Amino acid sequence: MNEWYAKNLGLETSEYGTTFEWRHADDPAKTGSTSWCAFPQDTKYFNPSGKPFMINYRVENLVELVAELKKENVTIVDEIAEYDYGKFVHILDPEGNIIELWEPKNE
């Protein structure tokens, strides 16, 4: 899939996809990013949603956020996982879409 996007749309990616950096229109000093990554059609990574995509949000204080989401009866799919580049957890929205919450390290 990545080869198709590179050949046809010029989108160069790594095994982790690619990142588009941008600036806030009302505060150009403030930056953000959007990540794009294609997964194989038979991936299990988006389970249990059954949808062919996943939304990922950067968050602060993931442990506190998960505690609040549990109080609101939000479906928490897994336990918080910690890696060199941050903490992650997955939740489901009311329509069953999987959402990855990411607290980057040192941000």
Name each model-derived stretch.
Residues 3, 7-17, 43-107:
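Vicinal oxygen chelate
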Residues 40-44, 105-107:
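A short, sequence-level motif marking secondary-structure junctions
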Residues 22, 41, 82-85:
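Generic structural "secondary-structure junction" signal
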Residues 35-41, 74:
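Short amphipathic beta-strand starts and helix->beta connectors
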Residues 1-37:
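Core segments of cupin and vicinal oxygen chelate
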Residues 31, 49-50, 83:
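A generic fold-level signal
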